[in-house]
Curated annotation (Swiss-Prot):
Name by which UniProt lists this protein: Capsid vertex component 1
Function statement: Capsid vertex-specific component that plays a role during viral DNA encapsidation, assuring correct genome cleavage and presumably stabilizing capsids that contain full-length viral genomes.
Organism, scientific name: Psittacid herpesvirus 1 (isolate Amazon parrot/-/97-0001/1997) (PsHV-1)
Assigned keywords, A-Z: Capsid protein, Host nucleus, Late protein, Viral genome packaging, Viral release from host cell, Virion
Biased composition (Polar residues): 799-809
Location of the protein in the cell: Virion; Host nucleus
Gene giving rise to this polypeptide: CVC1
Length: 815
């Protein structure tokens, strides 16, 4: 919760309560440990006290444009992630005891997770967001420039307007019962003990009064919040298995209220003097109230609703009663409104619909009064406690929540930060599945000053699905002009992808894997160019007459050969040996000749390996980083590759190592070895040396041992900033190839900007003279051309940063 609270504070300082256009909505999420592991993140490094930080980039759907990388506040909980959300933190003042609050977990939902907040851009008119827009999250671990991991999500995974506040109904009762069992430490002073006992007595009175109307349970269960632990399956679970205890209690209370409401309507109609026809309509209204769960008013049902009336639809019967009762004299809600197809999925899934008027979006405050919490005067906690009786005649706490907050303040040490206001308000936790792994992702919505704060945003995918269903089309391009115009009226967020002609060549539009397809396309282009370059090099080095591949020694090494008499030139001719050419006919008994006969097969294995690698592996390779270095060198702006070795010297190569043997080949290096070449004493040969830094703190065992050609079963591939390549076999033999020449044939210059925005940063973002558009410090400054409603950069907020001494938290600069 700390990460979410600080992110909301900075966001509120920058944008206030505005939502839409240049002011993004902030979605608070928790990425489960299993989700991060499936993306290749070593979570054990996050939990072992290593420093790390997180960065976020928004990649807009249909235009290949994206925001700048921005560091966000992040906290990692190694286990029991929802403890950080639902339970007050009183560990500092608990005198080494176990915490008074606890949640019951099972083996499937006790996982940890990463707490971050993501900006969600939506149009200012309808507040719709494009669910296909991608969100890239990068984690840099151990402060190492090369130790980073990237995760890709979509807005549809990380931002949802539905909530589950109802599942939090019994949390305060459970926490109150748990704190009543707290044993007072003997070291407490008498005044502190007295205040605690007085407040606990008052709390017991309030609990007793509340328990007279419903059954209270002191067990807080994680499965009430985390609704699934495994990937979602097509068949929904049975209702008796999916329903939680809180929902059952709510249904019982709601049924009682429904019966009371129906009886009141029937009694009123019976006592009212009416004509016979009107009396029949009154009886019908009462029957409708009792049978359908929709209480009517005291008059005959009216089917004409006032335009713009709020649709009082909710997930529970209790919510329906409260919503319709609050309407008072407003127009009656018709049955068709309750059966609105756009809410069906949310209701069946146990979610609450968007809490706003669907006709005219009204942004709501989503965070509490941050000033009263952030601008704390540091006064002792115990001086602010209101005792239950005696002591100055102060007003006793009137609710369980007030008592609970005061008791937590007493347990905490004096001078510690105050409890977050979010902890003592309703909290919604919605579980979604990651598209790539099926692992759970939590979307958290906090209350607004104790009131439920429903997200004002709406997913444009809902309007898109309705338009396609009504037209009988399977793709947005199949819609006619009128249907497209109606879709854009309901969901302006699709204005750019609907008109995307240029991006259609590189992206799979209106697809959850749109960004992945774009990245795979980049990998395919580079792989094709690499294979072509190697094919050209092999063709040039092949003796057409003898049909043998001739390998020259490139790196200067002394070769140990058993029989010098069989060597070309005889004994004492090692300099000539070093530059000699070997084929299958000359010196057939020596390993250089055997290597020459196997070289073509090894190159073929290497090409197959390139084609089958994942993009995550490819993005860390020396081949891709050399291409980035080349693009950065050609760009007019001063840029640095993101967390990649950057060397513009053409004598410096980034090498990937592949080990061969037993009929296969596998990559050895994760990040490339950076090696400098220089002329050797022997004419025509090269010497080389490592210039990489020390081994990564994350992997201290990864010590550089072998230069290219030193190990008997390593095939080494290196590229410099000019995309000149070296393919080095054991012994220093190899081929030279030109990747830049073949890459130009398959690379589109329109891709340069998209690649640089994703894999580099402007050199003067951190330090240096400020740019003229310093307002671009906001995350959305560079997306003015991405959507019509982002026309200019917003005002720049003051830098909001915080430093934490915990190894699980990061120093941050927020949106």
């Amino acid at each position: 919760m700390e990460a979410h609270f600080v992110a909301a504070a900075a966001h509120s300082a920058a944008f206030g309560d505005r939502v839409g256009g240049e002011s993004p909505y902030l979605s608070h999420i928790v990425l489960s440990e299993r989700c991060m592991v499936n993306f290749g993140v070593p979570t054990f490094l996050l939990a072992s006290g290593n420093n790390f930080y997180a960065e976020v980039q928004i990649r807009f759907h249909g235009c290949l444009q994206c925001t700048q990388w921005r560091r966000v506040f992040s906290v990692y909980a190694p286990s029991s992630a929802i403890d950080r959300i639902l339970l007050p933190d009183v560990s500092s003042g608990n005198c080494g005891r176990s915490a008074p609050f606890r949640i019951m977990y099972d083996s499937g939902n006790s996982w940890g997770g990463l707490f971050i907040s993501v900006p969600v851009f939506c149009d200012p008119e309808k507040l719709t967001f494009d669910g296909y827009t991608a969100v890239a999250v990068r984690l840099a671990i151990c402060g190492s420039a090369d130790e980073f991991y990237e995760m890709l999500f979509t807005y549809d995974e990380l931002a949802q307007p539905q909530t589950r506040f109802y599942a939090d109904a019994g949390r305060f009762d459970a926490l109150a019962l748990q704190i009543c069992e707290y044993h007072i430490p003997a070291a407490w002073p008498s005044r502190r003990k007295e205040e605690f006992l007085n407040l606990r007595g008052r709390l017991l009175e309030l609990i007793a009064a509340r328990g007279s109307t419903r059954q209270l349970d002191k067990v807080l269960r994680a499965d009430s919040y985390i609704t699934h632990e495994q990937p979602l399956v097509p068949d929904p679970p049975k209702e008796d298995e999916a329903a939680s205890e809180a929902k059952k209690k709510e249904a019982d209370d709601a049924m009682k209220k429904l019966k009371d409401a129906a009886a009141k309507v029937a009694s009123s109609d019976a006592n009212r003097q009416r004509e016979p026809g009107d009396r029949e309509q009154g009886v019908s209204a009462a029957l409708l109230s009792t049978c359908s769960g929709m209480p009517g008013d005291h008059h005959a049902p009216q089917h004409a609703a006032v335009a713009g009336a709020v649709k009082a639809v909710a997930s529970g019967l209790n919510s329906i009663v409260r919503g319709l009762s609050a309407a008072g004299g407003a127009a009656a809600t018709s049955a068709s409104q309750l059966a609105d197809i756009r809410y069906t999925d949310a209701l069946l899934a146990g979610l609450e619909p968007p809490g706003r008027n669907r006709g005219e979006p009204r942004p709501q405050r989503r965070v509490p009064d941050l000033e009263s919490v952030v601008m704390d005067d540091g006064q002792s906690r115990h001086d602010r406690v209101i005792p239950a009786s005696g002591l100055g005649g102060a007003r006793a706490p009137a609710s369980v929540e007030e008592c609970l907050k005061a008791l937590c303040a007493i347990i905490s040490d004096p001078g510690t930060p105050p409890q977050s206001a979010w902890t003592f308000g309703p909290i919604s936790i919605v579980t979604h599945s990651c598209y790539n792994s099926g692992s759970p992702i939590l979307i958290v919505t906090y209350s607004d000053g104790g009131r439920r704060a429903y997200p004002p945003i709406v997913s444009g995918i809902t309007a898109l699905s309705e338009a396609l269903l009504a037209a009988g089309a399977s793709f947005p391009s199949d819609l006619n002009e009128d249907e497209k115009a109606e879709l854009l009226r309901k969901a302006p967020c699709f204005a750019r992808p609907m008109a995307a002609d240029e991006a259609r060549e590189y992206q799979k539009l209106f697809s959850v894997d749109s960004e992945q397809v774009f990245l795979f396309g980049l990998q395919a282009r580079v792989t094709t160019a690499m294979i072509t370059a190697l094919t050209v090099a092999v063709a040039r080095a092949t003796d057409q007459a003898a049909d043998n591949l001739l390998l020259n020694q490139i790196v200067s090494y002394d070769l140990a050969v058993r029989d010098d008499d069989d060597l070309p030139g005889g004994r004492g001719q090692r300099d000539r040996l070093a530059v000699a050419q070997y084929d299958g006919d000359r010196a057939a008994g020596h390993w250089p000749a055997k290597l020459a006969s196997q070289a073509a097969d090894l190159i073929a294995w290497f090409c197959v390996n390139l084609q089958t690698e994942s993009f995550a592996t490819f993005a860390r390779s020396g081949v891709w980083k050399a291409i980035l270095t080349s693009l950065v060198a050609e760009d007019t702006l001063h840029r640095l590759p993101f967390l990649a070795p950057f060397h513009s010297d053409p004598a410096i190569y980034m090498f990937d190592y592949f080990r061969f043997g037993a009929g296969n080949m596998s990559r050895v290096t994760g990040d490339p070895n950076v090696i400098r070449f220089k002329p050797a004493l022997r004419t025509g040969l090269m010497d080389c040396e490592f210039i990489s830094g020390a081994a990564s703190p994350a992997h201290p065992w990864a010590v550089h041992k072998f230069l290219p050609g030193q190990f008997h079963s390593y095939l080494c591939v290196g590229l410099n900033s000019e995309l000149e390549g070296l393919l080095i076999f054991p012994g220093g033999f190899g081929l030279r190839f030109d990747l830049g020449e073949t890459l130009d044939e398959v690379w589109d210059k329109n891709l340069d900007r998209a690649v640089l925005d994703r894999y580099s940063r402007l050199a003067n973002i951190s330090g240096g003279p400020p740019r003229a558009d310093r307002g671009a410090d906001c995350a959305i400054a560079d997306v003015g051309c991405a959507y019509p409603y982002l026309k200019s950069a917003p005002r720049a907020p003051s830098d909001f940063s915080t430093t934490s001494t915990s190894g699980h938290e990061s120093v941050t600069i927020l949106y």
